[in-house]
Amino acid sequence: MTKTASEILNNPFLNKGTAFTKEERQALGLTGTLPSKVQTIDEQATQAYAQFKSKPSRLEQRIFLMNLFNENRTLFFHLMDEHVVEFMPIVYDPVVADSIEQYNELFLDPQNAAFVSVDAPEDIEATLKNAADGRDIRLVVVTDAEGILGMGDWGVNGVDIAIGKLMVYTAAAGIDPSQVLPVSIDAGTNNQKLLDDPLYLGNRHKCVSGEQYYDVIDKFVAAEQQLFPDSLLHFEDFGRDNAQVILDKYKDQIATFNDDIQGTGMVVLAGILGALNISKESIKDQKILSFGAGTAGMGIANQILDELMQAGLTEEEAKQHFYAVDKQGLLFDDTEGLTPAQKAFTRKRSEFSNADELTNLEAVVKAVHPTVMIGTSTQPGTFTESIIKEMAAHTERPIIFPLSNPTKLAEAKAEDLIKWTDGRALVATGIPADDVEYKGVTYQIGQGNNALMYPGLGFGLIASTAKVLNAETLSAACHALGGIVDTSKPGAAVLPPVAKITEFSQKLAEVVAQSVIDQKLNKEPIADAKQAVADMKWVPEYRAISK
């Protein structure tokens, strides 16, 4: 190593702060540049956690953690490993939303991200190379921030989403933080608030679209694959008009994943499989109502559709299990303004004697009698008592997932769903929910959090050197997550808790890697999936550094 003392102390992948040993300080030219006491990482973590707890708000806590992240990746992840449940909502959803909104005011450090500008496509390769800085990149999370967390278009501010996502990957699954790269594709913004803000740090023009936009995406993917051929490319929070198009183009060519389309769908499918493990029913007997037919809602529907086809149904047979409801009501094949994703799940008016009346959720529930109802509408309180009781009157164990977040946008509260169904509902929410006490039973509420799925999934794909991610591997991951449910316990959650995320992420990674190997989709020869995962796992402990 030929770096200077200053370069080492300012490199978050190398810096240990006061944990550099006396021998390291001498060898690296650090003698006298740090206080004399040599601390252990546990002592540093105790000190850092006390500072974290002293912050007066969750945003202040996030700023503190991000500063620690900028200074010392190993200590940051060591601390997060000890407090993963407490830190998850702070480094990611929901507090990251506050950070995005105030990104211009709070900006201090690019955090090793790559900022690709639509106005300079000729610089894409150099941008990625500079940001990687010689590191062996195995995972790239890229966003154009057009569809942030139900917040909409936030331009270059959305890079915090990519950074936060990668934090969860490392904390949950053990992906080496020096092998990841967050990327912002700055295609402009249609957010007038940002365009009018003199502090805005991104391209100050409306979003580009069409051929110019897709040309930049193509150039980016080509450069990313050339520079990082062993990487997984994770697309995050793209607008719904572009997300599916991009995924469809590349999913059969490279190892890629769209968390909003596939990740949400996978977690919801895993939750449904967990619920069906409890109710002892078959997925082939379910009627599925999707309330909210945007990117997330249709991504969920597509994932369940694939599972029904894996279970032996034809595509047309599987589609008969779905009812998509949006602001227009039930979506029919003659509904105007449908997206390509929505068109795949429309119904025919001839199926209903009262088709013209199916313009709201309650009317559709009465007509269809769904057994599964999934909310991604961001319309608060729309799963009303009368709607839920109508649904519960026609199925013994209604599966109800109000997934919209944050809390103020949720379709219903878990405690209400348990009460309105007399404890029969199998519930998952989009945000953490407290246990519900009802008639002597403690009902644990699963959280439909994508973080339950994508870290283990991604790690398994990387460890197995997967060429692509296909339906069979997606299904294997969903069954693995849904199979963790304790079916013998009254009130059991349909999904495992975030508190155990490191345990089941490891299991998921092993299942995914095995699926890839079984299908001969691995680029490199791998004899043992478990060993491949174990060999790649990074642990947040200091390693010896020498000249």
UniProtKB/Swiss-Prot annotation:
The cofactor required is: Mn(2+); NAD(+)
Keyword NAD in the entry? The reply is yes
Q: Which reaction does it catalyse?
A: (S)-malate + H(+) = (S)-lactate + CO2
Identify its protein family.
Belongs to the malic enzymes family.
The cross-references to PANTHER family, in alphabetical order and at most eight, read: MALIC ENZYME-RELATED (PTHR23406), NAD-DEPENDENT MALIC ENZYME, MITOCHONDRIAL (PTHR23406:SF34)
Q: What function does the entry list?
A: Involved in the malolactic fermentation (MLF) of wine, which results in a natural decrease in acidity and favorable changes in wine flavors. Catalyzes the decarboxylation of L-malate to L-lactate.
Q: What is this protein called?
A: Malolactic enzyme
Q: Which organism is it from?
A: Lactiplantibacillus plantarum (strain ATCC BAA-793 / NCIMB 8826 / WCFS1)
